[in-house]
Amino acid sequence: ARAALTQDTVWVCTEGQVQDLPVAGNAVIGVEAELAYELACDLPPREQPYSEADVLAAVRAAHAAIEVCDTRYAAWGVQGEWSRLADQACHGALVVGSGRADVAALQPLSVPVSLWVNGTLAVQRPAWGNPAGDPLRLLTWLANEGAHSLGGLRAGQWVTTGSCTGTVLVAPGARVMAKLGGIGCAELQCV
């Protein structure tokens, strides 16, 4: 599934910055460690499909990120697939942390991932934990098909490739850190 993220729900942090994230209006606070790609070039719809190499050449950097899940419904996790999609795929916020620019050398399927809550390890994966598979394959699909209704992908956009850890529910006041080995770290404080 894909859903466009609105600019007011994306926070891009500098190296070492902990993002204060307002959560007073959240129905739930679910956190997930994710890999986010920052695009340097447009990938408009075209007749000839983009190759993985084409897509990789359009990426400025790969970053560690935390997606904060929320719902606009009264209850969490009881909606069907179409209702979840209408709920912006349960997106609440995206906090983008540090990253690396040499994406051609990156092997995301072998990246260790950890998610920390209040200094305690909540989830650890020795390698990529997203059941959808290779994030570059997902990004290539998005460039070739998934983003056509949005006019393609554009320079400056962020593309997150799904949870590596599953969703961990946290309480207001929680401090969360996602680490993607060899890529970077993202941190937030629920305020």
Predicted features along the sequence, with ranges:
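Catalytic-core "active-site belt" of small-molecule-metabolizing enzymes
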Residues: 1-134, 139-140, 147-148, 175, ...
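A conserved acidic, glycine/proline-rich C-terminal tail/linker
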Residues: 135-171
